[in-house]
Amino acid sequence: MPVPCGSSCGRNAFMRRPKTGDTLCKECFFLAFETEIHNTIQQEQLFRPGEKVAIAASGGKDSTVLAHVMNLLNKRYNYGLDLVLLSIDEGITGYRDDSLKTVAQNRDDYGMPLRVLSYQELYGWTMDRIVAEIGRSNNCTFCGVFRRQALDRGARLMEVDCVATGHNADDIAETVIMNILRGDTARLRRCCDIKTGSKEADTIPRVKPLKYSYEKEIVMYAHFKKLVYFSTECVFAPNAYRGHARAFLKDLEKVRPSAIMDIIHAGEQLQIKGTVKKPVRGVCGRCGFVSSQQPCKACVLLEGLNRGLPKLGIGKKSKGERMVALQEQQLREKAHLVKNDF
């Protein structure tokens, strides 16, 4: 027997929302999904009229839905935003080269300018070459660090006011779990922020419009909207630490469907004792990009690769980082002595 749509629109329901349990027809689900994202944008004041916003586009379901919804809401509610696409090519054969075709499709569909930056262009390395050097045990460390900085570099090149990323509720809950398991108190609180960075701190802000959107609903939205997205998993991802947190979260969700939002809200309410030493975010003296250490992690990892010591910067506070920091200090001291001689 057909179940009527819970919004009393007169149509039959076709789904039960994973997030709320509401039975909705396709049209009402679309509207509810889009309205929730709009409300998040408004309540958190993520954008201001006239801003140039770069959408971090990978071609996957999250960034594809983000590009579609941002384009739709920008017109529906007259945000007055200048939307562009920013993609990073890590140099993973059979994965990123194919996903960039989907990004190009988004560019054509929504008429958004697209800028693609590659690891080869920025660092002189591709992930294929990096994995050949270090193996698959720590490859995600390199990729994550380089990708975060690449987005900052791309945002600066495109002269945007902020970067919108496709992080969804599942992603954030997984990150909370990972940081708890690692005992990383600094990142544990920051990972729940819907907006990070600021122009005052000379960093281009990043925002997460999909912060409260469930991954299951993003997939359903993309499927029923017939959006074209790239669904193949990264060939280097199976060994990622995040996979264990994801599996744990899925098990929790089976027992308690609200577990995802519960974990996010717990992270948001977390308060760290004043006696706990927190890293101070500044600017790397070598590359000029945001960092909480000198030199930044990207510079340490890159130096290791270039010197034939690919594991130089691996670890929470690696020997390599201490060595590079000491070299930086010695160079500054030498420069100071030379300056005094004149």
Curated annotation (Swiss-Prot):
Q: What UniProt keywords apply to this chain's record, in alphabetical order? A: Cytoplasm, RNA-binding, Transferase, tRNA processing, tRNA-binding
**Principal subcellular localization:** cytoplasm
User: Which region is the signal sequence?
Assistant: none
**Keyword Disulfide bond, does the record have it?**
no
Query: Quick one: which pathway?
Result: tRNA modification; 5-methoxycarbonylmethyl-2-thiouridine-tRNA biosynthesis
Of the GO CC terms on this record, one is:
cytosolic tRNA wobble base thiouridylase complex
Q: Which InterPro entries match?
A: CTU1-like_ATP-bd (IPR056369), CTU1_C (IPR032442), Ncs6/Tuc1/Ctu1 (IPR000541), Rossmann-like_a/b/a_fold (IPR014729), TilS/TtcA_N (IPR011063), tRNA_thiolation_TtcA_Ctu1 (IPR035107), UPF0021_CS (IPR020554)
> So what EC number does this one have?
2.7.7.-
Instruction: Give the record's family classification.
Output: Belongs to the TtcA family. CTU1/NCS6/ATPBD3 subfamily.
Which NCBIfam families does its entry note?
TIGR00269 family protein (TIGR00269)
Q: What is this protein for, i.e. what is its function?
A: Plays a central role in 2-thiolation of mcm(5)S(2)U at tRNA wobble positions of tRNA(Lys), tRNA(Glu) and tRNA(Gln). Directly binds tRNAs and probably acts by catalyzing adenylation of tRNAs, an intermediate required for 2-thiolation. It is unclear whether it acts as a sulfurtransferase that transfers sulfur from thiocarboxylated URM1 onto the uridine of tRNAs at wobble position.
Tell me what this protein is called.
Answer: Cytoplasmic tRNA 2-thiolation protein 1
Organism name: Anopheles gambiae
- Upper lineage: Eukaryota, Metazoa, Ecdysozoa, Arthropoda, Hexapoda
